[in-house]
Amino acid sequence: MQFDTRVLRQWNVPKLRALQRYALRRAGEDSLPQVAGSLTFTTVLSLVPILTVAFALFTAFPMFQSFRAAIEGYLFSNLVPGNISRPILTYLNQFSHNAKGLTAAGLVGLVVTSVMTMLTVENALNAIWRVRQRRPLAQRVLVFWALVSFGPVLIGASLSVSSYLVSVSAGYVAKLPYGLGVVVGLVPILLSAIAFAMLYVFVPNTLVAWRDAFLAGLVAAVAFEIAKRGFGYYVARFPTYTAVYGTFAALPIFLLWIYVSWLVTLLGATIAATLPIIRQGYWQRRAFPGSEFFDALGILLLLHRARDHAPRTLGELDIGRRLQLEADYVADLLIQLKTLHLVGKLQQDRGQAHWALLCDAHTTTLRPLYEKLVLSLPRLSRTAFAHQLGDTRVLEAQLHNPALDCTLEAVFASGEPGVVKAAAEAAAAPAAATLAASARA
């Protein structure tokens, strides 16, 4: 019996195309190449201070001094292509050694530079997760100080365990089946995946599931390894920078590699941020003229129902899950509703705002909401009838639709069918106005 692939195509091809459109739109919104370039510049300024602070811990704690050489070798053999790792390691060690002779004011400047770079990283990740509320400065500094302080220690401990396992199994790798040697060789990728996952979980000021963070970290680690090998092959086979820059060739090559590294890191962050959306299917939402008005009515209906149950509020993530809408799209609609004094933000829970309905549903009509979300000029410019009705007031003069004078209470009394009916009746007004304008033309 042959399998009919037409059914499979009917279910998967449209979804894959929608997912492709969503991925391209999300990548454009996040501006990953531009953000990676900005982070490259700040990384160059703060790389020496961060390494100075991190490696100073091994001097302060004698029990960890043996880790430093192992960590340096691990970092520059797994994070930097071998063609440029040796001169870069020499320069950074020299710079870090020179930094130890700075005065107190100079050391404060180095620490400030390091913190500013870390804050830039946090801002970039918050933008990818669409987080609008930042942590207090003290908490942000403590989080990054913990990452810089304990990160090398954890890496050193992991390297010690890995070295012990490799030494124990050295005599058995050739005899054991199922590619145990390959498994041992995957330890650096696993460590990189864990490091990426920790970055994605702890840095953004929002709740990130460990499974999403680790899966994205694993993708980033594999992409990082592929990029490292490809970059090393390119530098070895096409020594363009060496021919042009001579002895200074390591600097532009290192800058380019930092840029590629940040690009991979941000790509992994985008994957971690979009996995919940893809898993729930929110990326398949289709936008149409009046869709924001319809979705805003759905949000108001949920908040209206929440009034009867404690705590009488709903979080942005909860609203998005119930309506199957993206978190950033829900946040934008809530801000629009807040400007109309229809809803209010009451509290903040680690990046997730909680909202409540503030307006009187018995007296508030649909007209202000419709004028805000449908008749505003920036939104009209994206609709099909914008070229016929360029002036918002011309369109408004055509709209004598009694459905817009209906109160929210009357709409919500019928539940979801009432919302659909109100949106459908209100959506008839633009079509009527378009026909009238075409008749006059």
Swiss-Prot record:
The chain crosses the membrane at residues 44-64, 101-121, 141-161, 182-202, 207-227, 248-268. It is found in: Cell inner membrane. InterPro entries: UPF0761_bac (IPR023679), Virul_fac_BrkB (IPR017039). One of its GO terms (cellular component) is plasma membrane. Its main location: membrane. Keywords: Cell inner membrane, Cell membrane, Membrane, Transmembrane, Transmembrane helix. It is a multi-pass membrane protein. The keyword Oxidoreductase does not apply. Belongs to the UPF0761 family. This is UPF0761 membrane protein RSc1559.
